[in-house]
A protein has these predicted regions:
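C-terminal TM-helix exit segments that contain a strictly Trp-centered aromatic cap at the helix terminus
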Residues: 47-57, 124-129
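Loop-to-helix transition at the N-terminal end of transmembrane alpha-helices
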Residues: 29-49
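Membrane-helix boundary connector in multi-pass membrane proteins
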Residues: 95-107
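Membrane-helix interface/capping segments
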Residues: 54-77, 90-94, 98
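N-terminal membrane topogenic signal
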Residues: 1-10
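N-terminal signal-anchor/start-transfer transmembrane helix
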Residues: 10-29
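Hydrophobic, aromatic-rich membrane-embedded alpha-helical segments
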Residues: 111-133
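Hydrophobic alpha-helical transmembrane segments of multi-pass membrane proteins
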Residues: 80-87
């Protein structure tokens, strides 16, 4: 399977849990899907496959920006990095969703955080964390 096809499949796989959290946050199907952790686990396995497949073959490193650039110059390494983003953004979004449900934070407050977490990862997390402190008066 080509990296392009795997990229499209991974992007499609990750949409279901995000849409469930955004559109039907209180539905049983959402609770089942998100609490199973199945989607991030499947993507993590895919990530692991590409890491094993490409490890040490790109000539790059994590010690300099130029080294990271060399790492990401290989399509399969870039694909692994993208899957890494998908897994961790989904993990953070699922935490936000669970925490909002547990603390009775309005879905209308949560929704922009989920969208930003999906699109810009840490920005959505930062917004959620700030709103959580504002509404609950506690960071954790």
């Amino acid at each position: 399977m080509t990296p392009e096809k795997v990229f499209r499949i991974a992007n499609t796989i990750v949409l279901l849990p995000w849409l469930l959290m955004m559109i039907v946050p209180h539905a049983e199907i959402t609770k089942t899907v998100i609490n199973s952790n199945a989607f991030p686990l499947v993507l993590a396995i895919l990530y692991g496959f590409y890491i094993v497949k490409t490890f040490g073959k790109s000539g790059g490193n994590f010690f300099t920006l130029a080294g990271v650039e060399r790492l990401f110059s290989k399509r399969e390494v870039l694909l692994a990095a993208w899957i890494h983003y998908l897994v961790f953004d989904l993990f953070v979004g699922a935490w936000e969703w669970r925490d909002a449900l547990q603390n009775n934070i309005s879905h209308w407050i949560l929704l922009p955080c989920l969208i930003l977490t999906l699109m810009f990862g840490p920005i959505g997390y930062l917004l959620y964390f700030g709103l959580r402190v504002y509404f609950l008066g506690m960071p954790f």
